[in-house]
Amino acid sequence: MEQNVGYVVQIIGPVVDVRFESGNLPAINNAIEIHFDGKTLVAEVAQHLGNDTVRCVALGSTDGLRRGVKAIDTGGPIKVPVGRGTLGRIFNVLGQPIDNKGEVQATDYWPIHRSAPSFEEQVPAVEIFETGIKVIDLLAPYAKGGKIGLFGGAGVGKTVLIMELIRNIATEHGGFSIFTGVGERTREGNDLWLEMNESGVIEKTVLVFGQMNEPPGARMRVALTGLTMAEYFRDVEGQDVLLFIDNIFRFIQAGSEVSALLGRIPSAVGYQPTLANEVGALQERITSTKRGSITSVQAIYVPADDLTDPAPATTFAHLDATTVLSRQIAELGIYPAVDPLDSTSRILDPRIVGEEHYYVARTVQQILQRYKELQDIIAILGMDELSEEDKLIVYRARKIQRFLSQPFFVAEAFTGRPGRYVKLKDTIRGFKEIIEGKMDHIPEQYFYMVGTIDEVYENYEKDMKGK
């Protein structure tokens, strides 16, 4: 087959214009390979400008690139390795391994631009996805094949929560996880990789990184690379896959940079006019089909804490559940620091989770909400000024608050406490006993950092016998 060869005619930062022979223009989203100075630069066709010229976005550095250099049309989009051979490896946006462990034994190579599953193939996300983490399973349950937004500032435990989820799906469900670092700090990616190696989770995980120092084209496409690898496990192997994207805001930010470089007129707050379309193209591919499911957990940075900013606001429309991590809760020493009143889930509905789960979850939230309202009175006047009924609510709320904490497997080395995976039925039973007053005689410290309610009983009875 004869190669379709063009020549570089203009370079503006990461944007490269290439002229091809008349009638031989490569299609939009095709990968173009540019060979110069012993390097290969891959760019992606973004626009047809007329005069047989295409405008491409480079996925690597254009340093040293000159006009007149040959550019070869590969005839299709970027293709990345998929299959079991990708597990335990680290890739860049082009699907090239960056962990110095040699070639990848790929089952196949798939293009990163693919259509979302058709309407007939999709299955609505109404089945609960058990994470083994009490606060999530009870108050903001994840849907199998759903999309979850993880909101939180620096140092409240986003990465630890992500690692625990990866560990739980690997050991309890035997499933695979794909972690995609989009515009991430390289140091954080390195920490994650080292911690995964230590905890043994790496064998069931694929890591894909497009860091902060990469050109915007790479940061914009790296999420699609990770998603394509996840789609293989869903569509061919019929697996339930977990896809982590950290951070979805950086994906939008990279799209905004590329949009400006391509000369598009910016929209609200300077974002790209194609914002909703770009986010939709990614999110619509993350779904359950008749074969398997992709459940995605997406860390979301909120610029200036403004939830009405177009980036988080557009992402919200796609989410099924939100897990909000709170600094106030972390300061109390309660981990995971999930805010039980701010976190929400679309499937916390009696028709999906059942009457008992719904009743227990809502009662727990009512008690915590009432405790929050009473805190000002307690701070000023003390506990003695409360009515007996309110005192009881405060005592139960403090037990609930502590019982929402849980020792994590991935944090064993730091806490010295063995991790706990709590089944959903045990979670519901435990909180039901607290709200029904069956645990009123047990002091609150026994509820801190335990798994099931049976552990609370055991520890209390052991101490009583000791006395």
Swiss-Prot record:
<keyword id="KW-0813">Transport</keyword>
<keyword id="KW-0375">Hydrogen ion transport</keyword>
<comment type="subunit">
    <text>F-type ATPases have 2 components, CF(1) - the catalytic core - and CF(0) - the membrane proton channel. CF(1) has five subunits: alpha(3), beta(3), gamma(1), delta(1), epsilon(1). CF(0) has three main subunits: a(1), b(2) and c(9-12). The alpha and beta chains form an alternating ring which encloses part of the gamma chain. CF(1) is attached to CF(0) by a central stalk formed by the gamma and epsilon chains, while a peripheral stalk is formed by the delta and b chains.</text>
</comment>
<keyword id="KW-0067">ATP-binding</keyword>
<dbReference type="GO" id="GO:0016887">
    <property type="term" value="F:ATP hydrolysis activity"/>
</dbReference>
<dbReference type="InterPro" id="IPR020003">
    <property type="entry name" value="ATPase_a/bsu_AS"/>
</dbReference>
<dbReference type="InterPro" id="IPR050053">
    <property type="entry name" value="ATPase_alpha/beta_chains"/>
</dbReference>
<keyword id="KW-1003">Cell membrane</keyword>
<dbReference type="GO" id="GO:0046933">
    <property type="term" value="F:proton-transporting ATP synthase activity, rotational mechanism"/>
</dbReference>
<keyword id="KW-1278">Translocase</keyword>
<dbReference type="InterPro" id="IPR027417">
    <property type="entry name" value="P-loop_NTPase"/>
</dbReference>
<keyword id="KW-0472">Membrane</keyword>
<feature type="binding site">
    <location>
        <begin position="152"/>
        <end position="159"/>
    </location>
    <ligand>
        <name>ATP</name>
    </ligand>
</feature>
<dbReference type="InterPro" id="IPR004100">
    <property type="entry name" value="ATPase_F1/V1/A1_a/bsu_N"/>
</dbReference>
<dbReference type="Pfam" id="PF02874">
    <property type="entry name" value="ATP-synt_ab_N"/>
</dbReference>
<dbReference type="Pfam" id="PF22919">
    <property type="entry name" value="ATP-synt_VA_C"/>
</dbReference>
<comment type="similarity">
    <text>Belongs to the ATPase alpha/beta chains family.</text>
</comment>
<comment type="function">
    <text>Produces ATP from ADP in the presence of a proton gradient across the membrane. The catalytic sites are hosted primarily by the beta subunits.</text>
</comment>
<dbReference type="GO" id="GO:0005886">
    <property type="term" value="C:plasma membrane"/>
</dbReference>
<dbReference type="InterPro" id="IPR024034">
    <property type="entry name" value="ATPase_F1/V1_b/a_C"/>
</dbReference>
<protein>
    <recommendedName>
        <fullName>ATP synthase subunit beta</fullName>
        <ecNumber>7.1.2.2</ecNumber>
    </recommendedName>
</protein>
<keyword id="KW-0066">ATP synthesis</keyword>
<dbReference type="GO" id="GO:0005524">
    <property type="term" value="F:ATP binding"/>
</dbReference>
<dbReference type="InterPro" id="IPR003593">
    <property type="entry name" value="AAA+_ATPase"/>
</dbReference>
<dbReference type="InterPro" id="IPR000194">
    <property type="entry name" value="ATPase_F1/V1/A1_a/bsu_nucl-bd"/>
</dbReference>
<keyword id="KW-0406">Ion transport</keyword>
<dbReference type="InterPro" id="IPR036121">
    <property type="entry name" value="ATPase_F1/V1/A1_a/bsu_N_sf"/>
</dbReference>
<dbReference type="InterPro" id="IPR055190">
    <property type="entry name" value="ATP-synt_VA_C"/>
</dbReference>
<dbReference type="Pfam" id="PF00006">
    <property type="entry name" value="ATP-synt_ab"/>
</dbReference>
<keyword id="KW-0139">CF(1)</keyword>
<keyword id="KW-0547">Nucleotide-binding</keyword>
<dbReference type="GO" id="GO:0045259">
    <property type="term" value="C:proton-transporting ATP synthase complex"/>
</dbReference>
<dbReference type="InterPro" id="IPR005722">
    <property type="entry name" value="ATP_synth_F1_bsu"/>
</dbReference>
